[in-house]
C-alpha cells in the first residue's frame, strides 16, 4: 500500500529498491515473485538495494582481536542457516549468487536493473564494520563491537577473492 498511496498523492519515482537476505526474507522463488509482482503492478524498475549470502560459519574472532563479550557475532545466526536453500560454503555462495543474478535479470519487462552487495569488503580486521568502538561512541551505543558481516563478504577472511565475485564479474544477461 505504501507505493500505491505514494502514487495516489502524485509523487514520482523511477526505481523501487528491495532488501533481500535469504536468512531473513525467504527463498529466491519468493523474491522472484515479489519482484515480478511489483514490476507489473507499478511498472517500475527494481534494484536489490542490499543482498548477501555467507560463505562460511567459521569463526573470525582471531582476526577481530575482540573478546567474546565485545563481539557482535554473525548477522546470520546459526539457527537462521537452516532457513537458507544454499549451504554456507564458498560453493554455496557462488551458486546462490548465480541464481540470484539470473532472477534479477529475468524480472518481467526487463525491470530488473541491478543490486548492491552488503557488504562486499568487510573482512574481519580490527576496526572493520559499522560497530567499531569509535562509531559506537559517536552513536552513544553501548555495543558490542565487531563486524557481523565478515562471513558474507566477497573476500575470505584473509582478503582473497571468492568465486562469488567472479560470478558477478562474468555474469551476462
For each feature predicted by the language model, list its residue ranges.
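Aromatic-rich peripheral "rim/lid" segments of glycoside hydrolase catalytic domains that contact
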Residues: 33, 37-40, 56-99, 103-111, ...
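Noncatalytic carbohydrate-binding groove/subsite architecture in carbohydrate-active enzymes
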Residues: 1-76
